[in-house]
Each structure stands twice: as C-alpha cells, then as structure tokens.
Curated annotation (Swiss-Prot):
It is found in: Cytoplasm. Belongs to the RRF family. This is Ribosome-recycling factor. It comes from Francisella tularensis subsp. tularensis (strain SCHU S4 / Schu 4). SUPFAM superfamilies: Ribosome recycling factor, RRF. CDD domains: RRF. GO terms for biological process: cytoplasmic translational termination. InterPro entries: Ribosome_recyc_fac, Ribosome_recyc_fac_dom, RRF_sf. One of its GO terms (cellular component) is cytosol. Pfam families: RRF. Responsible for the release of ribosomes from messenger RNA at the termination of protein biosynthesis. May increase the efficiency of translation by recycling ribosomes from one round of translation to another. The keyword Cytoplasm applies. The gene is frr. GO terms for molecular function: ribosomal large subunit binding. Keywords: Cytoplasm, Protein biosynthesis.
Length: 185
C-alpha cells in the first residue's frame, strides 16, 4: 500500500517535471534548437501535425535552423505556420527547404524570458508539492483507518519528502540551465 502511494507520487512528479521541461523548451534562447519548433503545427491532409513530423529540422549553425519538408508543397505551409507562431521568427523560403535565422535577444528581452522561466519553474514546484500533499493525505488516511502504524506513516512521509526534494532539485537544475542559456550572449 505504502509502496503504491510512493510509486504513484514519484511517477506523477516525474510527469510534472516532463511538462516543465516541455514548457521551458518552448522559451526561445538566442541559439538555434530544433525542439523550439516542436509545438508549431501545420494542416497536413486535414490533420494538425507538428512540423517535426512533416519535415527534417537541422541546426545549420549556432543561429540558424534548416527545415527540409518531406513533401515539396509543404514549404509554404511551414513558413506560414512559423510566421503565425508566437516565436517571433522570420523563415526564408528557398523553394524545397527553409532557413530560419534566430534573431539575437536584447538584454531587456532576456530578463523578461528569465522571469518567465522562473514563473514556469515555480508552477512546476507547486505541482510537485501538491502531489506530495496528496500522497501525505493518502498516508494519513491509511493511518486513520489503522491499516498502518504511526512509525510506518512517519517513514512514508519522510520518503515522500525525500522524493519531493529530489524532484524540486531537478526542476531547479532545469531552470538554471535554461537561465544560463538565455543569459549567454
């Protein structure tokens, strides 16, 4: 019972970390990264499809992405999707491929993005703490129903706290890496 609660809490915390990592990946740094375009979609035969599933995205240099669609007719759709996304990128259509230069970030924009990283990270921490609260509530419920002893409950709560501390440290590490990427000129 206790192991099930611990495993469930840890799995849910890992999912929260994955969501945080995805959210942080969407924040544009000055460097070219293919996963930046992962959430941009195009209409591909009537289905909203991520660009990553309709084209090959490569890093040409530190500030330029190359996009080679798997079908020639998709270049204009991909260009339009990137232009209408909230990324502030201007792709260049070369006919059978696209080039997407990454504009340099000014200091003010970098600071705004760092604030955004901090708020996303705090939301991730809150999510992890809520999972801890739920798990501790489940432990207290078992104790109330006399299915476990007080010592078992205390040990389980300590284990949940250790898992929580580990996950929050991972969230902080993700945020620190993203902030470092943002502040690098």
């Amino acid at each position: 019972m206790i192991n099930d609660i611990l495993k469930d809490a840890e799995n849910r915390m890992k999912k929260s970390l994955e969501v945080l990592a995805d959210d942080l990946a969407k924040i544009r740094t000055g460097r070219a990264q293919p996963d930046l375009l992962a959430h941009v979609t195009i209409d591909y035969y009537g289905v909203e499809t991520p660009i990553t599933q309709a084209a090959n995205i490569t890093v040409l240099d530190a500030r330029t992405l190359g996009i080679t669609p798997w079908e020639k007719g998709l270049s204009s759709k991909i260009e339009k999707a990137i232009l209408t996304s909230d990324l502030g990128l201007n792709p260049t259509n070369l006919g059978d491929s696209l080039r997407v230069p990454m504009p340099a970030l000014n200091e003010e924009r970098r600071k705004e993005l760092v604030k955004l990283v901090k708020s996303e990270t705090e939301a991730g921490r809150v999510s992890i703490r809520n999972i801890r609260r739920d798990a501790n509530g489940d432990i207290k419920e078992l104790l109330k129903e006399k299915e476990i002893t007080e010592d078992q409950a205390k040990k389980a709560e300590d284990d949940i706290q250790k898992i929580t501390d580990k996950m929050i440290a991972q969230a902080d590490a993700l945020a620190a890496k993203k902030e470092q990427d943002l502040m690098a000129v």
